[in-house]
Amino acid sequence: MVRLATEKDIEKVNDLRRQVNELHVKGRPDVFKAGFGQELQDFAYTLMNGENSDILVVERDGVICGMACVDYVCKPETPYGMARQFYHVQEIAVDEVFRRQGVARELFEFMKADAEKRSLSKIELDVWAFNESAIEFYEAIGFKETRIWMEYKL
């Protein structure tokens, strides 16, 4: 079952976010800081209480096994771009014990239905190139690559 996170869920949500952070530190130690300090932990409250953001959790048998931090984005038309309304996934995590058991797919199906209810036109996310298993999953459920960020190290 997917539902909105509550304050009682914050400890488990942050445990999942910590797992994501560790993956990113391992993949790009030149970009991400090791550890999961209080500021990162408190950010969950900001998302949960935000006007245009939420934290979703997947609960099975009373256990939170996955989560997603999402934003509801409405960008106005500009001289160089069209107006856009979309669902943005900031973070998504499945507890390592529950991976490959349909948790992420369940989250995605909820997000699709929720985005449609909110009259949002699409779901966007970004993923680091080192995260090959996530890329494989996103492609398998229908995400398409729309832009590529590159860097040139000096």
Kindly give the residue locations of the regions a language model identified:
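A short beta-loop-alpha structural element at the N-terminal edge
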Residues: M1-D15, H24
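Conserved GNAT-fold acetyl-CoA-binding loop/helix
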Residues: E22-A44
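Conserved beta-strand in the GNAT
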Residues: V57, V63-Y72, H88, A93
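Conserved GNAT acetyl-CoA-binding A-motif
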Residues: A115-D126
